[in-house]
């Protein structure tokens, strides 16, 4: 199956990434990607863009050259309370909010602490997708996190980059997560976690996890732009009607 949606990308606004937004748009057009989210790292990361970068995402057109662009962030989970580094009314101006553990912000601790932080973040209502929860540096109670995510309509990510250049050893955890989310009745999403435009929409390894878990396609948010937009609308994000022209094509 060809997946037309990517929820996790980084531009040169995060200085360890290497492509501009315009290069992503061109690559999306080339690959047939209909909708992607620009989700640079939250401001607590050392090389992340300033807080105002995310506030000013409102200047971005919703659709450029037939490609839909979601205004987003990959926020950092800061502590066991589940707080993230983007807050207040500004969250409501974003189309999509991702959050995950990153070592410069939240040092690896223990299974109980990681699990509590993720569940508290999920229950906060501020985050739509938890990124790379299969990271072996942050062991979690997978069943408990999957249950909390399902109960709060939050998706867990199968991160394709985890199998390539980072977070080595994630395969076992990601398969367990896919199976647990399936059992809990929750949602999954595949994210490229692209740091260069060439990787946009590359879910090669993540797809293998989805297939091995026999995960139901109707609960995979990448299955269509309509599916992702319906999820985000249900999560309370407004202004998504501006993508109607995209859905008509």
UniProtKB/Swiss-Prot annotation:
Its EC number is 3.1.3.-. One of its GO terms (molecular function) is phosphatase activity. Zn(2+) 2 binds at residues 16, 41, 195. Zn(2+) 1 binds at residues 8, 10, 74, 193. HAMAP family: YcdX_phosphat. Its cofactor is Zn(2+). Zn(2+) 3 binds at residues 74, 102, 132. One of its GO terms (cellular component) is cytosol. Pfam families: PHP. InterPro entries: Phosphatase_YcdX_put, PHP_dom, PHP_phosphatase, Pol/His_phosphatase_N, Pol/histidinol_Pase-like. It comes from Shewanella pealeana (strain ATCC 700345 / ANG-SQ1). Belongs to the PHP family. Keywords: Hydrolase, Metal-binding, Zinc. It is an enzyme of class 3 (hydrolase). Binds 3 Zn(2+) ions per subunit. GO terms for biological process: bacterial-type flagellum-dependent swarming motility. This is Probable phosphatase Spea_1436.
């Amino acid at each position: 199956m060809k997946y037309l949606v990517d929820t996790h990308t980084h531009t040169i606004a995060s200085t360890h990434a290497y492509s501009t937004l315009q290069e992503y748009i061109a690559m999306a057009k080339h690959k047939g990607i209909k909708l992607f989210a620009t989700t640079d790292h939250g401001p607590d990361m050392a090389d992340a863009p300033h807080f105002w970068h995310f506030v000013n995402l409102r200047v971005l057109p919703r659709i450029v050259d037939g490609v839909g662009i979601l205004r987003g962030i990959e926020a950092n989970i800061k502590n066991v309370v589940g707080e993230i580094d983007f807050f207040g009314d500004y969250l409501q101006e974003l189309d999509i909010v991702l959050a995950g553990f990153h070592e410069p912000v939240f040092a690896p601790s223990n299974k109980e602490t990681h699990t509590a932080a993720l569940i508290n973040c999920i229950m906060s209502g501020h985050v739509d997708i938890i990124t790379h929860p299969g990271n072996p540096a942050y062991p979690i109670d997978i069943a408990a996190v999957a249950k909390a995510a399902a109960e709060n309509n939050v998706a867990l990510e199968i991160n394709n980059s985890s199998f390539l250049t980072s977070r080595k050893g994630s395969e076992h955890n990601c398969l367990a997560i896919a199976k647990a989310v399936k059992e809990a009745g929750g949602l999954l999403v595949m994210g490229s976690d692209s740091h260069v435009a060439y990787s946009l929409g590359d879910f090669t390894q993540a797809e293998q996890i989805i297939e091995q878990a026999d995960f139901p396609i109707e609960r995979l948010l990448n299955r269509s732009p309509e599916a992702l937009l319906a999820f985000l609308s249900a999560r309370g994000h407004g202004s998504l009607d501006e993508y109607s022209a995209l859905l008509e094509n």
